[in-house]
Amino acid sequence: MAEVQVLVLDGRGHLLGRLAAIVAKQVLLGRKVVVVRCEGINISGNFYRNKLKYLAFLRKRMNTNPSRGPYHFRAPSRIFWRTVRGMLPHKTKRGQAALDRLKVFDGIPPPYDKKKRMVVPAALKVVRLKPTRKFAYLGRLAHEVGWKYQAVTATLEEKRKEKAKIHYRKKKQLMRLRKQAEKNVEKKIDKYTEVLKTHGLLV
């Protein structure tokens, strides 16, 4: 059986519910999905309202034994994971298997920092929300309700961006050198190029 291709999504700039709905559908269909930069996910509505909603949710607990649940996740990645879980039949075998196919991260840890990340246009804030509408960042909400790693994640992101910049600069330099090398030998290999073209090996 062929290996299932992993779909790596960049959560930054996406709306929470819309992205969760698309991810839920994909994992049910059998795709493996990884969502990175969950702290950059947006929620429609102003920040204060969203915070009040979450604080109301924090008050929901089992009076006699709060350790039995419901569990209130503080990390943005876990808040997103819980949102997706609510869209899956997670108490069935099929739903549990679908949830196992989902991975969520704050920031972009290795090996996903070297992989191509995708966006979902149908869930992007700039596409789905009017420019005048207010929105909140999931990272800020999580930080204000008890997530302790906002600063750590931000520092690691800065380091990753610096590394990526250096890598891209090197890549551009190599491409420039390759182009120059091709130009230098263009006249020398002209006759071979023509032969290859006549045999249909070069277009």
UniProtKB/Swiss-Prot annotation:
Residues the record lists as Phosphoserine modifications: S77
Molecular function per GO: mRNA binding; RNA binding; structural constituent of ribosome
Keyword Ribonucleoprotein: yes
GO biological process, one term: positive regulation of natural killer cell proliferation
Citrulline modified-residue sites: R59, R140
CDD domains: Ribosomal_L13 (cd00392)
GO cellular component annotations of the record: cytoplasm; cytosol; cytosolic large ribosomal subunit; cytosolic ribosome; focal adhesion; GAIT complex; large ribosomal subunit; membrane
Modified residues (N6-acetyllysine): K191
Keywords: Acetylation, Citrullination, Cytoplasm, Phosphoprotein, Ribonucleoprotein, Ribosomal protein, Translation regulation
Subcellular location: Cytoplasm
Residue list for modification N-acetylalanine: A2
InterPro entries named in the record: Ribosomal_uL13, Ribosomal_uL13_CS, Ribosomal_uL13_euk/arc, Ribosomal_uL13_sf
Free-text description of this protein's post-translational modifications in UniProt: Phosphorylation at Ser-77 upon interferon-gamma treatment in monocytes involves a DAPK1-DAPK3 kinase cascade and is causing release from the ribosome, association with the GAIT complex and subsequent involvement in transcript-selective translation inhibition.
Domain of life: Eukaryota
Database matches in PANTHER family: LARGE RIBOSOMAL SUBUNIT PROTEIN UL13, RIBOSOMAL PROTEIN L13
Oligomeric and partner information: Component of the 60S ribosome. Component of the GAIT complex. Interacts with EIF4G1.
Primary role: Associated with ribosomes but is not required for canonical ribosome function and has extra-ribosomal functions. Component of the GAIT (gamma interferon-activated inhibitor of translation) complex which mediates interferon-gamma-induced transcript-selective translation inhibition in inflammation processes. Upon interferon-gamma activation and subsequent phosphorylation dissociates from the ribosome and assembles into the GAIT complex which binds to stem loop-containing GAIT elements in the 3'-UTR of diverse inflammatory mRNAs (such as ceruplasmin) and suppresses their translation.
Family in the record: Belongs to the universal ribosomal protein uL13 family.
Descriptive protein name: Large ribosomal subunit protein uL13
Organism of origin: Homo sapiens (Human)
